[in-house]
From Swiss-Prot:
It comes from the Bacteria. The gene is psbL. One of the components of the core complex of photosystem II (PSII). PSII is a light-driven water:plastoquinone oxidoreductase that uses light energy to abstract electrons from H(2)O, generating O(2) and a proton gradient subsequently used for ATP formation. It consists of a core antenna complex that captures photons, and an electron transfer chain that converts photonic excitation into a charge separation. This subunit is found at the monomer-monomer interface and is required for correct PSII assembly and/or dimerization. Its main location: membrane. Keywords: Membrane, Photosynthesis, Photosystem II, Reaction center, Thylakoid, Transmembrane, Transmembrane helix. PSII is composed of 1 copy each of membrane proteins PsbA, PsbB, PsbC, PsbD, PsbE, PsbF, PsbH, PsbI, PsbJ, PsbK, PsbL, PsbM, PsbT, PsbX, PsbY, PsbZ, Psb30/Ycf12, peripheral proteins PsbO, CyanoQ (PsbQ), PsbU, PsbV and a large number of cofactors. It forms dimeric complexes. This is Photosystem II reaction center protein L. Belongs to the PsbL family.
Length: 41
């Protein structure tokens, strides 16, 4: 991931977008777990 030094100024926005994407996936996963536990109960 950190192969390229600070060459492209687009590396930071891409990393921010990737981080937000992973946060969104984590949020969906947690919500899915909560819903599944509610449905199981």
């Amino acid at each position: 991931m950190a192969d390229q030094p600070e060459k492209n100024p687009n590396t930071q926005p891409v990393e921010l977008n990737r981080t937000s994407l992973y946060l969104g996936l984590l949020l969906v996963f947690v919500v899915g777990l909560l819903f599944s536990s509610y449905f199981l109960n």
